[in-house]
Amino acid sequence: MLNHLTLRRLSMAYIIEDFKTNSYFINFNKAVCRLEEALEEYDKYGISSSRDGVIQRFEFCTELAWKSTREFLLSEGYVDINSPKTVMKQAYADNIIEDDEAWLELLYSRNLTSHLYDDSTASDIFNSIKNKYLGLFKALIAKLKG
């Protein structure tokens, strides 16, 4: 006969496996791969349209990252986590992400991309994507995969 702890472990394993088939999570994985491809293309050709493509793919990744994390937290029983900041703060509290300040900076950068009119800001965000944000996305995927 199964005890309570064994049933809980089986239940959590099912929730995690079910989450891995979640469309947000699947699309987040794909979007991060596309972001890496765009960064490689920029490194290879160095043209500004490639940089713009990196920034656009970053926008997709950011949306899918917080929505995937939200779905994971909902599957864990959380409610009232409807904004990107709230989701990522809860993810930090649950040790899903390690650096909440970096994620808040990432979300701020994402908001700036909606109003990008100057080359300097675009360049700064591009460098952050390449040097920091891509790593955050990859770490999140690894953590959510369990």
Regions found by a protein language model. Give the residues of each.
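Solvent-exposed interaction patches of small proteins and small membrane subunits
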Residues: 2-146
